[in-house]
Amino acid sequence: MVMGFVNVLKPPGLTSHDVVQNLRRLLKVKRIGHGGTLDPLAAGVLPVAVGTATRLLEYLQGGDKAYRAEFILGLKTDTQDLGGRVLARKPCPPFTEKDLQAATRPFTGTIRQVPPMVSAVHYQGRRLYELAREGLEVERPARQVTIHEFRLIRAWPDGPYYRALIDITCSRGTYIRTLGADWGDYLGVGATLAFLLRTRAGSFRLTDAWTLEEIAGAIDRGERTFLLPPAAGLAHLPVIIVPGEFIRHVSNGVAIKGDVCRPLPSLREGDIVRLETGEGQLLALARVEPDTRGSFLLKPHKVLK
């Protein structure tokens, strides 16, 4: 049975769903899903779960993401990227890199962001991008996101505009195009996303990603080195080693007492942990629950069989 994660290097021009469809064809497996949509025009890391690893996607998506983006300052479009209709053009003053970096400060830390109309957010049973295609715009509530890093790499004039290359590390649910557009508005000139590369999604990094062509070549050679174990996408969750005599309990979904496992990380009620064998095999994800005797239980939440 094929099961695990694939760290795919998505090319520009394909949707995230296109990548999933390609992998279904290559691996001859239907149960495949991706760990967070990457815009069609963007490139970079797209984690994909195969087989029963799809049950872990909700935990994978909790990890932070990192991007390298290029913005054009002085240009505004209705989609906040170069695929949209131009709304405004405004010549830029002679910005310095110090000016531009200082203007990123209001957009670091915990901020509120309004999803763009071209997003996949649901509104009354429909996706926002479906409404946008019909020329409609609706009110969208702002969402809280966290920007850990908004760092200017380089900026240079380009005719009446400025181009800025930025490294961004952020929480899930952050819209990079909107972050850039809001930054441009703060600078008084507007901004549009010109290029986007996702360099990290959780523990999946660009340097380890596989192109679809590389995956196809490996399959032709009878290799599966691109297929990572289920635990590969869960590095942010604490690991607890289950003693051999309790492995069957966990595999059957039976809760075990925390004090039978050693060593134990610092845990709180409600935490999600990885239960593994001494050999590193992922048995289940478990939730920490209180015990009547003042200790705690590890209740299997997602069992891998």
Curated annotation (Swiss-Prot):
Give the enzyme class. Answer: isomerase
Which GO terms fall under molecular function for this chain's record?
Answer: RNA binding; tRNA pseudouridine(55) synthase activity
Question: What InterPro entries does this protein map onto?
Answer: PsdUridine_synth_cat_dom_sf, PsdUridine_synth_N, PUA_sf, tRNA_psdUridine_synth_TruB, TruB_C
Q: Which residues form the active site?
A: 39 (nucleophile)
Record's keyword annotation contains tRNA processing? yes
**Which Gene Ontology BP annotations are present?**
mRNA pseudouridine synthesis; tRNA pseudouridine synthesis
Q: What are the PUA domain coordinates in residue numbering?
A: 237-305
**According to its UniProt record, what is one Pfam family this protein matches?**
TruB_C_2
* EC nos: 5.4.99.25
UniProt keyword terms in alphabetical order = Isomerase, tRNA processing
Task: Tell me where on the tree of life, at the top rank, the source sits.
Answer: Bacteria
Q: Does the keyword tRNA processing apply?
A: yes
- Chemical reaction(s) catalysed: uridine(55) in tRNA = pseudouridine(55) in tRNA
Report the sequence similarity comment from the record.
Answer: Belongs to the pseudouridine synthase TruB family. Type 1 subfamily.
This chain's protein is named tRNA pseudouridine synthase B
